[in-house]
Amino acid sequence: MMRIPYRAVVPRATLLHARFSRPPAVPSLTKAFIVSRRTSSHASFIETGHIDVKDDEGLVFVNNIFPSKLQWLLQGPLSGNKTYEEALKRINRPHLAASDPLHIIRRVFPQSLNVDIREVIPRFREGGAFVKYVRKDGVRDNDIVTAVQHHLEHNPIRPWFNPFQQVKVAHVHGRPWIEDLYRIPSQRLRVEFLPGSVDGAATELTTETLYSFFRRYGKLRDIERQPTDSKIAPRYAFVSFTRQKYAVMAKNCMHGFTIPEEEGGGKSGTRIKIKYERKIKFSVIKDWILNHPRIVIPAIAALIAAITVTIFDPIRTFFIEMKIKATLQTEENSVLQWIRNQANKANIIYFGRQRTDPRRLTAIWEDRQGDIKQLQSWLMENAETFIVIHGPRGTGKRELVLDRALENYKYKVVIDCKQIQDAKGDTAKIARAASQVGYRPVFSWMNSMSSFIDLAAQGMIGTKAGFSETLDAQLSKIWQNTATALKRVALSNRKKDDKEAHLSDEEYLEAHPEQRPVVVIDNFLHNATESSVVYDKITEWAAGLTTGNIAHVVFLTTDVSFSKPLSKALPNSVFRTISLGDCSLDVGRKFVLSHLEHGAKDGANSGQNMEEVGDLGTLDSCIEVLGGRVTDLEFMARRIESGETPRAAVNRIIEQSASEILKMFVFDPDIESKQWSHEQAWHLIKTLAHSQDGTLPYNQVLLSDLFKENGETTLRALEQAELIAISSVNGCPDAVKPGKPVYRAVFKRLTENKTLSSRLDLDIVKQLLSSENKSIGKYEQELQVLGSLPKQPRELSARIQWLLQKVASSQNKISQYEHESAILQKVLRREH
């Protein structure tokens, strides 16, 4: 049997040319020998992109012989030295279905068909191949195609890679274009109408004509003609098939076909040019996105926000819940409890039994046992209001709540407002707030980047896109996730089979206030301003926790005006308040002695100090100077333990406090940013030092010439700075006293310094002189206006008399101030 060579042409950049050398199964094809054409002849249609068909030759297209869905393999290792056909042969499965393309093509043509196959040109991307054959005399192309189609109907071929679809064959009417461009087949074809000759004109085919030519290749979905008002040339129409394989067959069989005049092609005929049309053009999408930034940018921002809420919020809530439960889990862990007990036993053996109160505050807690029990009872009640622990700095508010009242409480969250307020910038504030409750992951650094993106978007579309979030929005997210975690913790002990399973979550929390966590907000209103976003969001969130029965909220503050911001959050509620002050003389003595007794048991030289304290009898007088402030008493006790006498320890406290006052209120270079002046602060220090009982009437201070303008605002600012304290009677300010009891001794110590006192008094006199001179200038200006009138009405005489009296009064004050100034200057000269 003769071998008949089959030539497979791969229209790729590598221009591979595979030679099929197996004999066909058709006996008639083995009678002739097809001589292989020269390379130049083969390269001719590769370079031109067209297949030359002679008069005695025909061309058919066979589909479904290559896996078109695996066309991405052509860009991989298969594009090297080994051909696509060889790779297919390696995965040949002849026992399952049709295998390699050569075998499929042999089976396409029946054995009785009198044709010779000349060439096979595969189209890998389209999943088919062109087969060129030679006709015998008297045989027509239609007869050959009909015979092949009839043969495939009775002997269907299903390749291994697509066993659910059969191989189909169609006659090529046009002049197909053999190209290796990156064009993906699709169900939609763009049919362009070109003239059949150089001097002819193309005719736009009707929908009926297009249907008659393309329906034979498969089910049509739609035919869309070019709009009549369109000026795009050449004219075109879109032909959509229901399946991609129909469109592939139609393109390869009809491309380059010239429609004659009798079939609607015009006088010179109309040649059709076909190419694949992608349904979605990425360039169109890109252009639409770039041309509609007002829609796209906010949509992207909303999408990012939705993704963030969906993915990160549950994670953040989980971490917050884990931080709330972390302490309890550690305490309830049996292994950790055993290790802790063994360590305690070892410490007792080697170091003796130690007290559980390292600061020896037992005497203080015994005195405040009523406040502790009151707070614990409030936490067991169902009251939708805030609990406020108020007192000056150093009175032990935090220790009383956390170490005593909540010592055995399961779940508690502590938020330190001072850390948040002292952070510089919104990014730092967000990070501090998140770390307090365990909110993570937090991308606070992205807030600055998002601000730049928002700024660029504002320049493009005129409004902000919403990428960046304000401090208000970020804090709202943090507190909202914290509230969700707190509610989960409060409901963690609830079981489905208990007696109260029929109650809703809200009803259960309302019925069991003991199950709610406790939120402690420390340093509330620290460094607060009129419009503080941090405190507004905290109070708003705390109100939601309280009214929703999610948690108990306890505020710790030194600000006496705490009711104003809290009333905005809960306007119709009465707050439960505990005011902590300085301890009494007896409690202070017990506190100091407990320190000294503990030091004596430790073997320190505090035993000698105990004897000195008893001999000198100065402990009570020293405690009276300190006034019962816990922090000052603790400092004095430690100085005594280190070897100092009580009086020396008190002197050290006075000296340190004096230095702090001078630095903050008298010699502060940044005084312009404060709400008070050096002269106002020194005036209060001087008058309080010279007062008999260490207090001044509130109204008397306001009547001073130094406090004529914004006097109450200045006093409140000095109270916030803890230089003074304002006591109230029935809610009205009544008296001004030093901010700390020891400050009375500090003020006296400062005024005893003649040089410092004279210098600061001289500054006050200068300010008063300047104020009176300005007043006289105003009076004189008004008198000048009145004197310029041509006739002075009788009604102005009273006004003129009043102005003259004011000028005289101010002049008398100026004379007095100048006399005082001269005396102070003499003192300064004498001291130097």
Swiss-Prot record:
Residues 187-279 form the RRM domain. Residues 41-294 are mitochondrial matrix. Pfam families: RNA12, RRM_1. GO terms for molecular function: RNA binding. Belongs to the YME2 family. Residues 766-831 form a coiled coil. Residues 1-40 form a transit peptide. InterPro entries: Mt_escape_2_C (IPR018850), Nucleotide-bd_a/b_plait_sf (IPR012677), P-loop_NTPase (IPR027417), RBD_domain_sf (IPR035979), RRM_dom (IPR000504), Yme2_C (IPR039627), Yme2_RRM (IPR034260). Plays a role in maintaining the mitochondrial genome and in controlling the mtDNA escape. Involved in the regulation of mtDNA nucleotide structure and number. May have a dispensable role in early maturation of pre-rRNA. The keyword Transcription does not apply. GO terms for cellular component: mitochondrial inner membrane. This is Mitochondrial escape protein 2. GO terms for biological process: mitochondrial genome maintenance; mRNA processing. It is found in: Mitochondrion inner membrane. The chain crosses the membrane at residues 295-315. Residues 316-832 are mitochondrial intermembrane. It is a single-pass membrane protein. Keywords: Coiled coil, Membrane, Mitochondrion, Mitochondrion inner membrane, mRNA processing, RNA-binding, Transit peptide, Transmembrane, Transmembrane helix.
